[in-house]
Amino acid sequence: MTDIDYYFRHNWKPDYDKFELTGWKLLDKIDKNAHILDIGCGYNLFKEHFPNLYGIDPYNDKADEEIKFEDYQPHKNFDVFLALGSLNFGDEKTVDNQIKHLYNITKKNDVIIWRQNPGLGDHPWQGVEEIKFFPWSKDYNEHFCSKYNFELKTFMKDKGDRYYVEWSRT
């Protein structure tokens, strides 16, 4: 079992209350009938609020499917993709591969809603010091959007030193 596997299976806990834009407020922002893929859904807390949400997570059996994002092949079309703290780990090559996969499974006008960590290992749980956080920034967002045919629609600070980011597939 890897450090990140152990950390998310045994130590990490969700706390949507501490985020203003990327927490429970998303319930009012996203159309209730949207077809949503929740990437790294954790405990799948949005599932009960959206009838067409499908949650994937490599470390949590509350997901609809326990699978790494890079290995997931959609079983249907989605129009909203949530990455609320899930594609924040590893080096640039790792994140680039994840975004390439995101490009491959999205279509024109799909929306991606992110909670991005700017590289801070500030989780309060034991084992966080072993996790490599990717240093998200506006520059990285612009770089990946340009490279993979997305449009950066929104980049703004959320509470807790995180970024609320929206991309649209062009």
Can you annotate each of these PLM segments?
Residues 75-77, 95, 144:
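Residues in flexible loops and secondary-structure boundaries
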Residues 82:
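A conserved beta-strand element that flanks and buttresses the S-adenosyl-L-methionine
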Residues 85-89:
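Short catalytic micro-motifs in class I SAM-dependent methyltransferases
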Residues 91-93:
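Short N-terminal helix/helix-N-cap motif within the alpha/beta-hydrolase-1
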Residues 96-108:
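A short glycine-rich, Lys/Arg-flanked "PGG" loop and its adjoining helix->strand segment in the class I
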Residues 1-73, 113-170:
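Class I (Rossmann-like) S-adenosyl-L-methionine-dependent methyltransferase catalytic domain
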